């Protein structure tokens, strides 16, 4: 992207119609008009921008978040050519150095909007298509998990779907090495362990995938979302959210007793989950939760294993991909590469205290990697 295009984005971004906004960032579809004198809905690939193509621009206020921002850009650069992840095209700082702009290839609507479109227009969606989506998400997660990385925010809004049914995982703002994250994600997609403040793991990604799996067939997002007041932050309400989850979606009982309709979720049960002492009680997903059109017995068993309260029993990514349910899709699996090296990670994030001082230098190096240079792996 040339300087004129970058300047146009900075000048006009705040006047655009954003499709997503929070206190930290804004997202917009942008396009240059034919003479590149203003912005509308804009686009391009590989840094060469053309009319009638679209890209997404993510504006982030830095405001001390140097580490989080740099990690997101770093992992996007590592996955730039990966089949299962959204492609980053460019990144640049605002003139005052207070904001950063991440330019991403527009891969299509997110999964939530995609399903809503079909429901609104009374269009039929193949149940096999849902399974194909889950399989592709699993393939993307395998790329991360094989490198001991976790996405940590898998949900409908972070999966985009192309017109041909290919998916791309997006929003790597919480992606990191295992043991580097303690709390990340979205209400309704957080595992019990995350809600209780434990370090994040691959099993937490699998939980989130289980939620997406169930919600796809129910054609409704946010099924497990706990109602919170506007002033309540999810990270401060872990006990409340977990209690809501257990009371509404699980049957809980003492060992060797009968299942009963009304759960009595006590501190003892939640503390047992926190300590991993699952022999103190028995549990199951409420059977009626899985009574969904198109969900066969194999689907139900996989969802049960993905949403197992015990992370040690939760289905892992390899078992999911190799399960009998997804055998017919295995030929579609593309072992798409990730240009990630532990040495690169340690260079940038090994000493987090240096990030702010070296931010511009590190950003420039990663930008060169995005633009196709081999700075990271150049040993000369």
Where are these predicted regions, by residue range?
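ATP-binding glycine-rich loop module of kinase domains
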Residues: 38, 43-69
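Short beta-strand micro-motifs within the conserved protein kinase catalytic domain, predominantly
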Residues: 87-100
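Conserved short submotifs of the Hanks-type protein kinase catalytic core
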Residues: 97-110
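Activation segment signature within eukaryotic-like protein kinase domains
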Residues: 133-134
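Catalytic-loop of the protein kinase fold
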Residues: 145-161
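Conserved catalytic-loop aspartate of Hanks-type protein kinases
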Residues: 205
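C-terminal lobe substrate-recognition/regulatory segment of protein kinase catalytic domains
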Residues: 246-295
